[in-house]
């Protein structure tokens, strides 16, 4: 068995790769950037360049063929089209197992990853698992992310969620579940909502960060329109800004509180990381700018 990890420079794929190195699982990393893996296990790959598809599935002498693919869709407005094209190519090369990274609010047949989910379900003799995590904790700590920069620069977090609650999850836990799915003997054409243990409002996130950092962090509450404008000011495209703001309104209405999932522990045997634990480990990311 050899695993192909698309989205090789992404946060989740990097953690999956780390797990596979420790457990000696053969894998290749597919991305446009060679920094995603070593020269030996990196494959040049671009979702928008079908000529790179064969290269992504090519293995070195002595390696077993690619048998399962981690699908991490690209950050495109129409992300489903290129991913579906790659799935069809991979199936033509006898790949029969896929694990898709989707999102908690996106169901099969819905927009974006939902279209990919539906396509996987329609292919005969293909088995799959879809992971549907809620919002990433690392959105608060990754350099360049709007929330991270807002905490560092303005000591605030922005949202249009009002008092809606989110069970934020760490990419570390998503990767642990993904590694289990990618190495499972069989996949059951199923989807799994992944959540962290703490159901938090953004007010509570700000309060937790205040305690960890020793300086006041606030929650700047916005309307959906105000948040979209703020995101566009920060360089987000209009399509993505309005989509993100609309998702915040869904959170305000309780979209992330309706399902309680213990899937991380069920898959891995270990409880997911709590928000305070995450914040303590990422404290250096939020040093205030002078």
From Swiss-Prot:
Its GO biological process annotations read: ergot alkaloid biosynthetic process
Q: Which UniProt keywords apply?
A: Alkaloid metabolism, NADP, Oxidoreductase
Which residues, by range, are in coiled-coil regions?
A: none
Q: At the top level of its lineage, which domain of life is listed?
A: Eukaryota
The reactions it catalyses are: agroclavine + NADP(+) = didehydroagroclavine + NADPH + H(+)
Pathway(s) per entry? Alkaloid biosynthesis; ergot alkaloid biosynthesis
Enzyme Commission designation: 1.5.1.46
Identify the InterPro entries for this entry: Ergot_Alk_Oxidoreductase, Ergot_alkaloid_biosynthesis, NAD(P)-bd_dom_sf, NmrA-like
Q: What class of enzyme is it?
A: oxidoreductase
Q: Which Pfam families match?
A: NmrA (PF05368)
Q: Which GO terms describe its molecular function?
A: oxidoreductase activity, acting on the CH-NH group of donors, NAD or NADP as acceptor
Functional note: Agroclavine dehydrogenase; part of the gene cluster that mediates the biosynthesis of fungal ergot alkaloid. DmaW catalyzes the first step of ergot alkaloid biosynthesis by condensing dimethylallyl diphosphate (DMAP) and tryptophan to form 4-dimethylallyl-L-tryptophan. The second step is catalyzed by the methyltransferase easF that methylates 4-dimethylallyl-L-tryptophan in the presence of S-adenosyl-L-methionine, resulting in the formation of 4-dimethylallyl-L-abrine.
| PANTHER family for the chain | PRESTALK A DIFFERENTIATION PROTEIN A (PTHR43162:SF1), PTHR43162
**Subunit and partners:** Monomer.
Q: Which family does it belong to?
A: Belongs to the fgaFS/easG family.
The name under which this protein is listed is Agroclavine dehydrogenase
What species was this sequence derived from? Claviceps purpurea (Ergot fungus)
């Amino acid at each position: 068995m050899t695993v192909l990890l698309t989205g090789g420079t992404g946060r989740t794929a990097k953690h999956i790769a780390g797990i596979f190195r420790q457990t000696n699982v053969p894998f290749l990393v597919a991305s446009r950037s060679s920094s995603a893996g070593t020269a030996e296990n990196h494959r040049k790959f671009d979702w928008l360049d079908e000529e790179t598809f064969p290269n992504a599935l090519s293995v070195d002498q002595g390696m077993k063929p690619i048998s399962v693919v981690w699908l991490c869709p690209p950050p495109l407005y129409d992300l489903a089209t290129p991913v579906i094209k790659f799935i069809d190519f991979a199936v033509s090369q006898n790949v029969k197992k896929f694990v898709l990274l989707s999102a908690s609010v996106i169901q099969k047949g819905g927009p974006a990853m939902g279209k990919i989910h539906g396509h996987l379900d329609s292919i005969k003799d293909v088995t799959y698992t879809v992971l549907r995590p809620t919002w990433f904790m690392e959105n608060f700590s990754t350099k360049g992310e709007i929330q991270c920069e807002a905490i560092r620069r303005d000591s605030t977090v922005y949202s249009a969620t009002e008092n809606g609650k989110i069970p934020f999850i760490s990419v570390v836990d998503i990767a642990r579940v993904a590694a289990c799915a990618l190495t499972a003997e069989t996949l059951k054409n199923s989807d799994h909502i992944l959540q962290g243990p703490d159901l938090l409002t953004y007010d509570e996130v700000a309060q937790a960060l205040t305690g960890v950092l020793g300086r006041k962090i606030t929650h700047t509450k916005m309307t959906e329109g105000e948040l979209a404008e703020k995101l566009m000011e920060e360089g987000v495209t209009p399509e993505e800004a309005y989509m993100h703001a609309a998702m915040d309104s869904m959170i305000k209405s309780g979209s992330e509180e309706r399902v309680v999932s213990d899937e991380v522990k069920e898959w891995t045997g270990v409880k997911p990381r709590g928000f305070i634990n995450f914040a303590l480990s990422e404290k250096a990311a939020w040093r205030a700018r002078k």
